[in-house]
């Protein structure tokens, strides 16, 4: 079994760019940014429980890494960068730390490196279980209306929230809930030490209005790019700013 994805082919000799979306997104999420890099072959992946991979269930990050590895092999992708937002960034960091043949580097936008104590994990597990229950039992428009009121999305205006609620409500609530719990921060290890000892290139992007993830970025041994005029979802709020940062990274 492999993950559903959309592949766009560029010039031979350059590494692939493999894009991983955030929670409740899909393979279209990164395309406005990714299509600015037409010289590179691009793979836009649907993570388990999302989009064309909605029917694929996983028990945890090991399963996601295994599926990602098999998907890369199926497309004969030998050299690549992982580019991930939020959940996709956490998947990218986990997979990279577990080891992926051909990995050139990881570019993470607003991805959490992991909670650092049992109390934080227990609180996150309670929270994610409550959200998962709502995703399973309530209309998605109502759930996402509350989801986007969370502090991490404070930089969004009302129009942006309405647009995101309408877009995300096309998902399957049950499969979102399953993926939310399988890849919860409550079950993700703290990756800070692994990332410090990494053998791959590692870059971190965060919006200038995203104070939580700017603080997290400062804890990581990564080259950090702050995206102007953006909050947590920087590639959506300022795609040109993210394109500029990716172009700078990929020139090295």
UniProtKB/Swiss-Prot annotation:
Gene3D superfamilies: alpha/beta hydrolase
Coiled-coil positions: none
GO terms assigned for molecular function: 2-succinyl-6-hydroxy-2,4-cyclohexadiene-1-carboxylate synthase activity
Protein keywords: Lyase, Menaquinone biosynthesis
InterPro entries attached to this UniProt entry: AB_hydrolase_1, AB_hydrolase_fold, SHCHC_synthase_MenH
Domain of life, source organism: Bacteria
Catalytic activity: 5-enolpyruvoyl-6-hydroxy-2-succinyl-cyclohex-3-ene-1-carboxylate = (1R,6R)-6-hydroxy-2-succinyl-cyclohexa-2,4-diene-1-carboxylate + pyruvate
Record EC number: 4.2.99.20
UniProt pathway: Quinol/quinone metabolism; 1,4-dihydroxy-2-naphthoate biosynthesis; 1,4-dihydroxy-2-naphthoate from chorismate: step 3/7; Quinol/quinone metabolism; menaquinone biosynthesis
HAMAP family: MenH (MF_01660)
Family: Belongs to the AB hydrolase superfamily. MenH family.
Function: Catalyzes a proton abstraction reaction that results in 2,5-elimination of pyruvate from 2-succinyl-5-enolpyruvyl-6-hydroxy-3-cyclohexene-1-carboxylate (SEPHCHC) and the formation of 2-succinyl-6-hydroxy-2,4-cyclohexadiene-1-carboxylate (SHCHC).
Name this protein carries in UniProt: 2-succinyl-6-hydroxy-2,4-cyclohexadiene-1-carboxylate synthase
Species per Swiss-Prot/TrEMBL record: Escherichia coli (strain SE11)
Top-level taxonomy: Bacteria, Pseudomonadati, Pseudomonadota, Gammaproteobacteria, Enterobacterales
Gene: menH
């Amino acid at each position: 079994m492999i993950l559903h994805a959309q592949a766009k082919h560029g010039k031979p000799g350059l590494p692939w760019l493999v894009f991983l979306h955030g929670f409740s997104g899909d393979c279209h999420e990164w395309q406005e940014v990714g299509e600015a890099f037409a010289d590179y072959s691009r793979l836009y992946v649907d993570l388990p429980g999302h989009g064309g991979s909605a029917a694929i269930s996983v028990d945890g990050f090991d399963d996601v890494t295994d599926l990602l590895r098999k998907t890369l092999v199926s497309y004969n992708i030998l050299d690549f960068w992982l580019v991930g937002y939020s959940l996709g960034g956490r998947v990218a960091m986990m997979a990279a730390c577990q080891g992926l043949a051909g990995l050139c580097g990881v570019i993470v936008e607003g991805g959490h490196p992991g909670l650092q104590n049992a109390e934080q994990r227990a609180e996150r597990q309670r929270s994610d279980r409550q959200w998962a229950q709502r995703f399973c039992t309530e209309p998605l428009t109502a759930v996402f209306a509350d989801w986007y009121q969370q502090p991490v999305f404070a930089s969004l205006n009302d129009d942006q929230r309405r647009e995101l609620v309408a877009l995300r409500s096309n998902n399957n609530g049950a499969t979102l809930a399953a993926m939310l719990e399988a890849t919860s921060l409550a079950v993700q290890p703290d990756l800070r030490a692994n990332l410090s000892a990494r053998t791959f290139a590692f870059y971190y992007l965060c919006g200038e209005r995203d104070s939580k993830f700017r603080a997290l970025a400062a804890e990581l041994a990564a080259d950090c790019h702050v995206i102007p005029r953006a909050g947590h979802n920087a590639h959506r709020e300022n795609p040109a700013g993210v394109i500029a940062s990716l172009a700078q990274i990929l020139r090295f």
